[in-house]
């Protein structure tokens, strides 16, 4: 099938210009600048006049809960939410049941995704104290990288032996994506909070327990290991101004920001409670503003969601009882477009952070850019198209979002994955299936 996307402003590789994109089957075959509609025989013509066209979002950080935790979410429901949000590729984390820490578990997950996932997929292999030989010998074409928990979080995959950490950083040929929080500091803070506030301290104390110090000390340790060994380190979900001081000097040591930490502050616990409880914790307005500034100065290189659905019953309680994590994949792009409107970053920088840089960092094969010969993963977004998040519009299986009630001015109008329009104006092709992403080819 031959498709023409015309009339829109193409945002790609640092420039915005009116251009048409020609797609044949699953591949971009031509990019034609100018306002004139190209002539030709097309099976499908998409009018993007008044809209912006950009490469589909690559979300490097999701927890789709499949396998083993599918009462909360699964690949089918969450990849549908991704498509509604303009996300055409996701990389899923390994803290599932079973954990993705063996080749057998990775193969099973890949096989499951073939029949379930509506958009393209990749899966991190997880490091443990006992599987370093496995993760350092894995086929580099199969996975984006190695996920390392240097702080204890959902799934109990903490790697806390210093000899194992050093060996991993020395041997790893793939990027290491690290969750950095110091568990000893967190445990001390929790003990102190429980002495003061009871067994289950209110969620407003979450950033005191999973504190700036806990994040900084662990991140500093990871950066030092990467500097010593030459490992390619990408630190997940920055939350503090202090941590950001460790970045910006080495192209092999980079950092991610996620949507929750760019939008919310600790003041929002009063309004949203445990719905915004996540690890690492949302911190101060000063920290949030520092993260926003780092989007444009090079210290933050990718935007993810850390999409981590839970049932609302699992979010009951406080710091000790309530589960950490929130669904966000459906709203990442429109939220970042709001930051564009607010002058935080340019549209071109948004595309770098959400498509180009993830593709470059993890060496994604033929995705992440609008280029001839690349896979036709595109998203069309429309400005000045207000809509409000309601229970009915939320696609995640858990059925809630901290963004519920929020009115966006931007709307994802169309999502194209591998040349096929899977989402258009609230209509979704449930028969669509994505592809396994290949790396380093």
Which residues make up each language-model segment?
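C-terminal cap of metal-dependent C-N hydrolases
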Residues: 372-438
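Divalent metal-coordination and catalytic microenvironments
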Residues: 8, 21, 26, 50, ...
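Histidine-rich, glycine-flanked metal-binding segment
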Residues: 1-4, 9-55
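A glycine-rich helix N-cap at a beta->alpha junction
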Residues: 111-127
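Metal-associated gating/positioning segment near the N- to mid-region
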Residues: 49-116
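Histidine/acidic residue-rich metal-binding segments in metalloenzymes
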Residues: 133-303
């Amino acid at each position: 099938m031959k498709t023409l996307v015309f009339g829109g402003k193409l945002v790609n590789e640092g420039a915005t210009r009116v251009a048409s994109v020609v797609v044949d089957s699953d591949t971009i075959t031509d990019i034609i600048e100018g306002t004139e509609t190209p002539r030709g025989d097309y099976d499908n013509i998409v009018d993007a006049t008044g809209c912006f066209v950009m490469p589909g979002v690559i979300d490097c950080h999701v927890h789709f809960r499949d396998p083993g935790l599918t009462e909360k979410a699964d690949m089918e429901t969450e990849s549908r939410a991704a498509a509604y949000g303009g996300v055409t590729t996701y990389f899923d984390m390994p803290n599932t049941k079973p954990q993705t820490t063996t080749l057998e578990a990775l193969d099973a997950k890949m096989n499951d995704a073939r029949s379930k996932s509506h958009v393209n997929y990749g899966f991190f292999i997880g490091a443990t104290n006992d599987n370093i030989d496995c993760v350092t010998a894995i086929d580099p074409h199969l996975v984006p990288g190695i996920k390392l928990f240097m702080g204890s979080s959902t799934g109990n995959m903490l790697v806390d032996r210093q000899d194992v950490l050093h060996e991993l950083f020395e041997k790893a040929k793939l990027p290491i994506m690290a969750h950095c929080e110091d568990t000893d500091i967190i445990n001390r803070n929790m003990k102190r909070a429980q002495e003061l506030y009871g067994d289950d301290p209110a969620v407003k104390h979450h950033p005191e327990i999973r504190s700036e110090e806990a994040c900084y000390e662990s991140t500093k340790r990871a950066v030092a290991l990467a500097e010593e060994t030459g490992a390619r380190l990408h630190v997940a979900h920055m939350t503090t101004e202090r941590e950001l001081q460790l970045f910006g000097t080495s192209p092999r040591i980079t950092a991610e920001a996620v949507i929750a930490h760019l939008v919310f502050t600790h003041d929002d616990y009063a309004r949203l409670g445990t719905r915004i409880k996540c690890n690492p914790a949302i911190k101060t307005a000063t920290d949030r503003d520092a993260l926003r500034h780092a989007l444009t100065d090079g210290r933050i290189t990718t935007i993810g969601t850390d999409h981590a659905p839970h049932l609302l019953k699992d979010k009951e309680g406080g710091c000790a009882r309530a589960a950490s994590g929130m669904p966000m994949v459906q709203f990442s792009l429109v939220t970042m477009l709001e930051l564009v409107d607010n002058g935080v970053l340019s549209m071109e920088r948004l595309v770098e952070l959400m498509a180009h840089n993830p593709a470059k960092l993890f060496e994604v094969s033929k995705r992440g850019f609008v280029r001839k010969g690349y896979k036709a993963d595109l998203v069309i977004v429309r400005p000045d198209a207000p809509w409000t998040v309601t229970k009915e519009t939320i696609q995640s299986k858990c059925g809630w979002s901290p963004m519920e009630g929020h009115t966006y001015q931007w709307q994802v109008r169309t999502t194209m994955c591998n040349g096929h329009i899977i989402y258009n104006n609230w209509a979704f092709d449930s028969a669509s299936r994505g592809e396994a992403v290949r790396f380093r080819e």
